[in-house]
Amino acid sequence: MAAPGSARRPLLLLLLLLLLGLMHCASAAMFMVKNGNGTACIMANFSAAFSVNYDTKSGPKNMTFDLPSDATVVLNRSSCGKENTSDPSLVIAFGRGHTLTLNFTRNATRYSVQLMSFVYNLSDTHLFPNASSKEIKTVESITDIRADIDKKYRCVSGTQVHMNNVTVTLHDATIQAYLSNSSFSRGETRCEQDRPSPTTAPPAPPSPSPSPVPKSPSVDKYNVSGTNGTCLLASMGLQLNLTYERKDNTTVTRLLNINPNKTSASGSCGAHLVTLELHSEGTTVLLFQFGMNASSSRFFLQGIQLNTILPDARDPAFKAANGSLRALQATVGNSYKCNAEEHVRVTKAFSVNIFKVWVQAFKVEGGQFGSVEECLLDENSMLIPIAVGGALAGLVLIVLIAYLVGRKRSHAGYQTI
């Protein structure tokens, strides 16, 4: 008779194999893009989880799934990029027409995954059962995945990227672009999520009286240049409008001005994306992204991303991003100008107030602003005095006509003696 323990061994072995299989499905995978010489220029090792909200005939539904182990790099769509022409990109395909794309860019000191996009096919009944639409959807967003040049980006914690109704979470991520030797660098830039939490501060003193509303921010000039010259000119004053929960559980809204005297600017020039990155007072990073619509030949503010520290907040690290904006639009080669204050809503909790903006992206001739395209707010403000002036002129004319008619009638009433 077999020993009692020996009967359990096949069952335990089967359970172990199933567990290893499940772990394998969720394990990190390596993706690589090589140039024509066979040298890797992009390496990425991560696992990814997707959360997608979509519509069914019975109502909204949420589907979560992992990047499968058989996901592959799309070689004919991935690229090491060409200087001043195109940026590096990694395109990963899986399932029935689903792709995850990481678009990279760099400046003199740092590189980043500037834009992440996800294309998903709702006709895939395995991932999206009972979907009311069979369309192929595309979503995209800027990210805070960035690292120093010649260092790898490392993030063991989950890195979330929100794209409208889709959230992509990268786990145990090691990513590096602009490689020269087909291997990850020893040096690394760690994500904020992996950094040690700050020491717990003592209880905050009683809240002071509300601080006064700051005056309008100072206007400063910014420019971004590449090897082909200037790709961005901007003159503007910037004010952050933040809503957050404080440590005492109260919700406050604060206005913070960007002080040009305590701000450094950098950026990058790409064929389809231009960025302006502002570092202010050692606690705030504000990123602007300008895109271009090739069919209409117009540029626009496409994305804004903010990372800042709010000492009195329950969560001092404040982050917000939106890569689907359509603001500050003008024809490529022209400049966009608005003297009126503009409010650009990024998220429910964050917006940017822009004062006296004058901006031009992509095509900048001779480092000077091109022909001006006025904003609607300025055009309306010009129409108001014209309308008021016209109304006053009409009123004066009516009074004058009434006076002349009255005078004529009074003369007609006299009799000659």
Swiss-Prot record:
Biased composition, class Pro residues, residue ranges: 199-215
Residue numbers spanned by region Hinge: 195-227
Record topological domains on the Lumenal side: 29-382
Glycosylation sites: 37, 45, 62, 76, 84, 103, 107, 121, 130, 165, 181, 197, 199-200, 207, 209, 211, 223, 228, 241, 249, 261, 293, 322
Record carries keyword Transmembrane helix: yes
Chief location category: membrane
Region (First lumenal domain): 29-194
Subcellular locations according to the entry: Lysosome membrane; Endosome membrane; Late endosome membrane; Cell membrane
Entry membrane topology: Single-pass type I membrane protein
TM region(s), chain numbering: 383-410
Family membership noted in the UniProt record: Belongs to the LAMP family.
Official protein name in the record: Lysosome-associated membrane glycoprotein 1
Organism annotation: Homo sapiens (Human)
Phylogenetic classification of the source organism: Eukaryota, Metazoa, Chordata, Craniata, Vertebrata
